[in-house]
A protein has these predicted regions:
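Second-shell loop/turn segments in exported
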Residues: 3-7, 51, 81-89, 120-127
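Extracellular low-complexity, O-glycosylation-prone Ser/Thr/Pro/Gly-rich "stalks"
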Residues: 121, 125-145
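Acidic helix/loop microenvironments that form the catalytic cleft of cell-wall polysaccharide enzymes
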Residues: 21-24, 111-130
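A generic secondary-structure signal for well-formed alpha-helical elements
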Residues: 24-28, 68, 105-106, 127, ...
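Peptidoglycan-targeting cell-wall enzymes and recognition modules
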Residues: 13-102
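Extended serine/threonine-enriched, polar tracts that run as long, contiguous segments within proteins
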Residues: 99-108, 123
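Surface-exposed patches in mature extracellular/periplasmic domains of secreted proteins
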Residues: 5-17, 30-33, 108-120
Length: 145
C-alpha cells in the first residue's frame, strides 16, 4: 500500500496514514466497521439511499464507506462484486480499497501540504476519534524511523 501510493517516500506522511489505519481498524483487528451502519442510511453525500448504510458501511484498512466509494472501487478494479457490500470488500480488498480511495482523494497531497489533522478529517469526514488518532500518530513518530 505504501509503495503503491507513494507514501513510502515520505516518512511523516507514512506515519499519518499508519496512525489512521491503526485507528480505523483497532490496530488491524477489524476490517469491517463495528457499528451496524444505520447511521449511513439516507446519506446522499455517500451515495446511500434509505437502506444502504449497513451494506456499505466501513470496510478495509481505511473503512471505505458509502455506495459512491464502493462503486468507484468496483469501477477502478473492474469487479462489480464489490457492490455486494462490506463483507466482500473487507475480506477480498482490505488494502486495495484503501489504495483506490487514497488515489481518488489525493491523500498523499493532503498529508504533505496540510498535515495530520487534515489527513484525519479527509479520511474520517470529521473529528471522530481524533484523540486516539493523535496517540497513534505519536506512537508512529516514535517507532517508525
Amino acid at each position: 500500500l505504501m509503495l503503491d501510493t507513494g507514501f513510502d517516500k515520505h516518512l511523516d506522511a507514512m506515519r499519518m496514514l499508519m496512525a489512521n489505519m491503526m485507528h480505523e481498524t483497532c490496530n488491524f483487528v477489524y476490517m469491517k466497521e463495528i457499528s451496524n451502519g444505520l447511521a449511513y442510511n439516507n446519506r446522499p453525500d455517500l451515495g446511500n439511499g434509505p437502506d444502504d448504510g449497513p451494506k456499505y458501511k466501513g470496510a478495509g484498512v481505511l473503512q471505505l464507506t458509502g455506495k459512491f466509494n464502493y462503486q468507484q472501487l468496483a469501477d477502478e478494479i473492474n469487479d462489480q462484486k464489490v457492490m455486494q457490500g462490506v463483507d466482500y470488500v473487507s475480506t477480498t480488498y482490505p488494502f486495495t480499497s484503501a489504495r483506490v480511495w487514497i488515489e481518488k482523494n489525493n491523500l498523499l497531497g493532503v498529508c504533505l501540504n496540510q498535515g495530520f489533522d487534515a489527513c484525519c478529517t479527509t479520511i474520517n469526514g470529521g473529528w471522530n476519534g481524533i484523540e486516539d488518532r493523535r496517540i497513534k500518530y505519536a506512537l508512529c513518530q516514535r517507532e517508525m524511523k
